[in-house]
Structure formats: C-alpha cells, structure tokens
C-alpha cells in the first residue's frame, strides 16, 4: 500500500501520479496522555495527541504544502510566494525545491532564527519583514503582478485545504471509521480545521462514517484570539486583533482570511472556540514533556491547556474521547537553558 497521505489520492485533486511530490510522509501517530490525568483534574477522560511533528519539515504544514505544490507542478506554475510564521515557509521551501519550482518566503521580524535558516537552507528566497504575518501577506499579495509569483497564502489558493483534509481522513481511519467526539485544533489561519471538517462531511456523504461527527474546537492564545471574540459575539466574521502577542507564534494570526469558514465549521459541528493564556500554554508544554515524554510545540500545548480549561468549565465531558493536534515538533522552538555542568578536572 502507498504510505502517508497519498494513500487517499482518489479523494485528492492531483490527477497524474508523476506530479505527486513526496518527501516520505508518514501516518502520524496517536499518543495517549495517561500520566497527565492528575494535572488535568478528576474529570479527565481519554485524551490523545495526534503528533504531526513526525511529518517532513517537522510540522503539519507539510500536508497542505505538499498537495498545493503538487498541484502547482501539475498546472505548470513556476514561482511561488508565501507569508509565514516559520513552518509553512519551511514546508514550501522543501516541497518547491523537490518539485524544482522557485519559492519566495516572507517572515515576521521575530520569527525564530532556526526557522529562517531552515527555509533558506532548503532553497527558498527568504526575507524578514518588520511587521506581523498580515504585513507579510500584504507584500506577497502586492507582489503577485509585479514579480510574477503565485500567491500561496492561506486560502488564496484552493489546494492547501485539500492537503489538510488528509488529517481528517487519516484520523477517521485510525479510529476505525468512528472518529473521536471532540477535536481540539490550534487555530491561526484555520486551514486544518476547515479541511478536516470538509473531510468528515465527504466521508459521511460516501457512507464511511456516520453522525455524530466530531465537535470541532478552535483553540487560540488569549493574546491573539479574533476567532474566539467573533464566536462569543455571535458574529460570522472576525475583526482584526490589535497588538497580537503570544508565545505560540504559529497561531498569532490577527486576521484570518477564512474566518467565516472557521466559524461555520465550529458552529455546524456543535463545537466552540476558546482561548488560553501563555502561562497555561507553557505549563501544559512542560507537563507533557516531563510526564509523558511528548515534546509539544507551543501551539500544540495550547490545545492541552484548553482541554484542561474546558474540562473545568464543563464544555467538554470526561466521557468524551478527545484528540489534541500537536502541529509541529517542539524541537523547532527555542527551549529554556537548563544545562548543568560537572567539572571533571
């Protein structure tokens, strides 16, 4: 059988096998968090992490960019550009190089150095921008005509969602076509949440899964929570979040292009949107590492913090099976210095 998400090729838009770019994608594992039960509280039920950090370039961005670059190859596109907080740029650089397509990447000024170097090392033209991700997106958009590149920003092309859809297809298969009750997803641009909801509806239409479909929970950081604010206010679109700040850079998206699609998926699934403080994110990250040996990225840790928070609030029950998405390996992020030295002289 075909490995990784190309096993679902019949449900994906790439028509020619020779255009299916691959860097050795795998089915990402499900890891139970049994030892975190005491920290989570008495109400804690069965909670599982889907660790997307095992994918090429170390993040779930590999799914969307692999599919989108494959379609770019199929359609004869020669130049691609993307704004990124780090991981999307790394994935684009790797897959574009694999496909022999030129790529241009624009990062906020405070993007971790390891991410910028990774992007450059894999062949992309990369620049730091004095601003946030939306400023980078504006540069990419304005340069489309002048530079002749194709805009690969979130939801500016239709195929990244198709790649992210494979998270839902894969998860359903891993659960023997009976998906979990709740999915908690770190939400910035929200492509993955939208794509998974699309996957579950497609699987339902062909009779592979049945109701109830998973409740989709959009998790954001308290320092950048435009989707949560819009959800709580009953709005269909989100407004720009001013002065966005959080340790979870991947979900620091002040204005998501697909805000209305995120909110629609959350509401259609009877889910909700919630935000957690940075202190809770860091505590969850430490708990998973120290108790379970699971190195969550800050965005993934946000889902664990949110699970604890919503167990206490009652919006999630201990009887519900819950999957938390860890969107990247924690090894790609700066860690606190804890070295102890021993003098052997």
Outline where the language-model segments fall:
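PLP-dependent amino-acid enzyme catalytic core
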Residues: 1-345
């Amino acid at each position: 059988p075909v490995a990784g998400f190309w096993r679902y090729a019949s449900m994906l838009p790439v028509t020619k096998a020779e255009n299916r770019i691959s860097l050795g994608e795998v089915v990402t594992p499900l890891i139970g968090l049994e030892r975190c039960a005491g920290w989570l509280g008495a109400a804690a039920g069965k909670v599982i992490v889907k660790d997307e950090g095992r994918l090429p370039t170390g993040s779930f961005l590999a799914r969307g960019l692999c599919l989108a670059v494959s379609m770019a190859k199929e359609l004869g596109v020669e130049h691609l550009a993307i704004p990124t907080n780090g991981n999307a740029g790394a994935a684009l650089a790797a897959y574009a190089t694999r496909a022999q397509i030129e790529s241009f990447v624009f990062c906020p000024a405070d993007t971790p150095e390891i991410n910028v170097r990774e992007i450059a090392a894999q062949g992309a033209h990369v620049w730091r921008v004095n601003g946030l991700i939306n400023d980078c997106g504006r540069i990419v958009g304005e340069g489309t005509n002048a530079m002749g590149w194709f805009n690969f920003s979130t939801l500016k092309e239709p195929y990244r969602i198709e790649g992210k859809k494979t998270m839902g297809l894969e998860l359903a298969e891993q659960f023997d076509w009976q998906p979990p009750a709740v999915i908690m997803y770190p939400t910035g641009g929200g492509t993955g949440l939208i794509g998974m909801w699309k996957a579950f509806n497609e699987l339902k239409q062909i009779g592979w899964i049945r109701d109830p479909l998973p409740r989709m929970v959009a998790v954001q950081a308290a320092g950048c929570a435009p989707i949560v604010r819009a959800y709580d206010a009953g709005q269909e679109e989100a407004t720009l979040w001013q002065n966005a700040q959080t340790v979870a850079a991947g979900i620091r998206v002040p204005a998501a292009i697909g805000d209305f699609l995120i909110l629609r998926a959350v509401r259609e699934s009877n889910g909700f949107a919630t935000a957690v403080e940075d202190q809770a994110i860091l505590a969850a990250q430490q708990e998973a590492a120290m108790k379970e040996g699971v190195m969550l990225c800050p965005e993934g840790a946000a889902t664990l913090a949110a699970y604890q928070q919503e167990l206490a609030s009652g919006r999630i029950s201990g009887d519900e099976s819950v999957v938390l998405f860890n969107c990247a390996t924690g090894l790609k992020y700066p860690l606190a210095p804890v070295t102890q030295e021993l003098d052997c002289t």
